[in-house]
């Protein structure tokens, strides 16, 4: 689809950027760039599943998800439920996915996530997203989880982390994308870590800042 659309029109976030970003294995590159990311274990095979089971990873409070998904689809939290976690991972592997396992970040229950939206590499606005994963399968409205979004000013540490991510993206691809969203949460050490980098049609949540739509329009016009 990306190749087809690229020949018919101009993608401001290029096909290569979107293709790279739609697979959460990009997180490994952020780690290699010494950017703080939630600890992430990739499960690619039944052998990997046996290994993490023997290590006791599934006995903890964890989040399991596929590397390629949208709207938290097939994402579940397993709170010290190794049998259910193993079944979920087995389901994802059988479906042909690579899966990831991350420790659940308990600070998210207190203060949610912070999302920062960037247009042409500049921070436009930020917001708070409430915790959406209860233990077990998350509730969904169709394919997408219902989200609680409210205005929030990103902290200095969060902004520094977001800027580091955007600098990495520019260095890797030679330019800033038209739009980007960096979702962060306070990690176990009390400092922000990246949950996700969204470069493929993320929700901008423009409603949290009445000037955000104008900033996005200006960013689009600046590329003409």
Please state what every model-predicted region is:
Residues 1-8, 15-111, 156-163:
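Active-site nucleotide/adenylate-binding loops and adjacent lid/helix of ATP-dependent enzymes
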Residues 69, 121, 189-190:
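Short strand-connecting beta-turns/loops that link adjacent beta-strands
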Residues 13, 69-71, 143-147:
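A short, surface-exposed helix-loop junction/capping segment
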Residues 77-172, 193:
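Phosphate-binding site of ATP-dependent enzymes
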Residues 17-20, 131-132, 185-187:
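Short glycine-enriched loops at secondary-structure junctions
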Residues 156-224:
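ATP-dependent carboxylate activation and anion-phosphoryl transfer catalytic cores
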């Amino acid at each position: 689809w990306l190749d087809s659309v690229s020949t018919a029109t101009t993608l401001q976030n290029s096909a290569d950027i979107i293709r790279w970003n739609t697979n959460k294995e990009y997180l490994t590159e952020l780690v290699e760039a010494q950017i703080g990311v939630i600890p992430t274990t990739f499960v690619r095979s039944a052998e990997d599943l046996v290994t993490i089971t023997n290590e006791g990873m599934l006995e903890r409070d964890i989040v399991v998800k596929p590397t390629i998904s949208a709207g938290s689809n097939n994402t579940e939290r397993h709170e010290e439920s190794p049998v259910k976690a193993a079944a979920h991972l087995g389901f994802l592997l059988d479906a042909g996915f690579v899966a990831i396992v991350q420790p659940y970040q308990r600070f998210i229950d207190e203060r949610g996530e912070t999302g920062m939206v960037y247009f042409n590499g500049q921070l436009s606005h930020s917001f708070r997203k409430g915790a959406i994963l209860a233990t077990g399968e998350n509730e969904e409205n169709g394919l997408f989880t219902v989200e609680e979004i409210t205005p929030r000013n990103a902290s200095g540490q969060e902004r520094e982390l977001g800027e580091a991510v955007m600098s990495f993206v520019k260095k890797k691809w030679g330019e800033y994308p038209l739009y980007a969203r960096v979702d962060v949460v306070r990690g176990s050490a009390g400092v922000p870590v990246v949950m996700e980098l969204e470069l493929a049609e993320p929700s901008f949540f423009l409603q949290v800042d009445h000037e955000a739509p104008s900033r996005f329009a200006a960013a689009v016009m600046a590329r003409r």
